[in-house]
Amino acid sequence: MAKEDVIEVEGTVVEPLPNTMFKVELDNGHKVLAHISGKMRMNFVRILPGDRVMVELSPYDLNRGRIIYRFK
């Protein structure tokens, strides 16, 4: 899948789940299941409930995503 095919949206982390998964509520009200991207995992970026994040969604499955950025 090419980088141009993804959908990037902003949201808020609602709750942490096991295995670095998070429930994220998007700005449009949808809730998605998201995991941390590899670069964030390598740099030990901490994500807590209430954090604003950028989530990358695949057009094929809009219920799962990847957290690619945590806003300061």
Swiss-Prot record:
Protein role: One of the essential components for the initiation of protein synthesis. Stabilizes the binding of IF-2 and IF-3 on the 30S subunit to which N-formylmethionyl-tRNA(fMet) subsequently binds. Helps modulate mRNA selection, yielding the 30S pre-initiation complex (PIC). Upon addition of the 50S ribosomal subunit IF-1, IF-2 and IF-3 are released leaving the mature 70S translation initiation complex.
Subunit comment: Component of the 30S ribosomal translation pre-initiation complex which assembles on the 30S ribosome in the order IF-2 and IF-3, IF-1 and N-formylmethionyl-tRNA(fMet); mRNA recruitment can occur at any time during PIC assembly.
SMART domains for this protein: S1 (SM00316)
Principal cellular location given in the protein's record: cytoplasm
GO cellular component: cytosol
Record-annotated S1-like domain positions: 1-72
Coiled coil location: none
Organism: Syntrophomonas wolfei subsp. wolfei (strain DSM 2245B / Goettingen)
Family (UniProt): Belongs to the IF-1 family.
Disulfide bond positions: none
Keywords, alphabetical: Cytoplasm, Initiation factor, Protein biosynthesis, RNA-binding, rRNA-binding
Designated name of the protein: Translation initiation factor IF-1
HAMAP family attached to this UniProt entry: IF_1
MF terms (GO), sorted A to Z: ribosome binding; rRNA binding; translation initiation factor activity
Compartment(s) where it occurs, according to its Swiss-Prot or TrEMBL record: Cytoplasm
PANTHER family per UniProt: TRANSLATION INITIATION FACTOR IF-1, CHLOROPLASTIC
